A protein has these predicted regions:
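Histidine-dependent nucleotide/RNA phosphoesterase domain, centered on the 2H-phosphoesterase fold
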Residues: 2-194
């Protein structure tokens, strides 16, 4: 069995601890926009439309359809407080660390971890490099909860309705368009819970 474990599978544990998994802090690297013909892709002379999914639960503000125009790479999700509150500490643990670019290694998807939100999260998997792992590992010295097992660096491109045919068609197109593309890092993003 190769199922991705998630803290969301143990929701009652975190409720008992008084921890809202949707309100944890996050440090991200903003990247240049991912330019793609997202909404219309011609395939065999047929225009395919990819319906966006936007969160029903407004606490999940980040689930907002096409997000490739304002992309980020999560360096660490799960701080016990908003990353802005840890800014001085983050600057200390990341002192001397810098990334200028990342490379798209593949295109894939994640299933929604929320039973009440049925969508696919279409992502650009990022090539894992020593410098990227170092940044992530430095941040792990700060108080946090791992909400998923292992670090899977990715940039979210879009949240789409849960339809396997649409998902697979979109992924096939994006692979041909984006794999191997380098994305410029625009800076740190300390996030925030709207």
């Amino acid at each position: 069995m190769n199922t991705q474990l998630s803290a969301h599978q143990f929701k009652e544990v975190y409720e008992w601890l008084g921890i809202n998994l949707s309100k944890l802090g996050c440090l991200m690297l903003d990247t240049e926009p991912i330019k793609t013909e997202y909404f219309e892709i011609m395939q065999d002379g047929i225009t395919a439309y990819f319906p966006e999914y936007k969160a029903v639960n407004k606490e999940r503000f980040w689930i907002d359809g096409y997000v490739g125009d304002k992309p980020h790479l999560t360096l660490l999700y799960g701080f016990m407080v908003e990353a802005k509150q840890l800014k001085n500490h983050i600057e200390k643990v990341l002192g001397g660390w810098n990334m200028e670019t990342v490379t798209i290694a593949d295109i894939g998807y994640f299933d929604s971890p929320y039973p009440d939100e049925q969508y696919y999260c279409i992502v650009a998997h990022i090539k894992v490099t020593d410098i990227l792992l170092e940044g992530h590992r430095r941040l792990e010295f700060l108080p946090h909860i791992n909400t998923f097992t292992g670090y899977k660096p990715h940039v979210t491109i879009a949240y789409i309705v849960k339809d396997e045919v649409i998902r697979d068609r979109l992924i096939t197109h994006l692979k041909s368009e984006l794999v191997g593309k380098e994305l410029k890092i625009n800076g740190l993003n300390y996030g925030g819970n709207k």
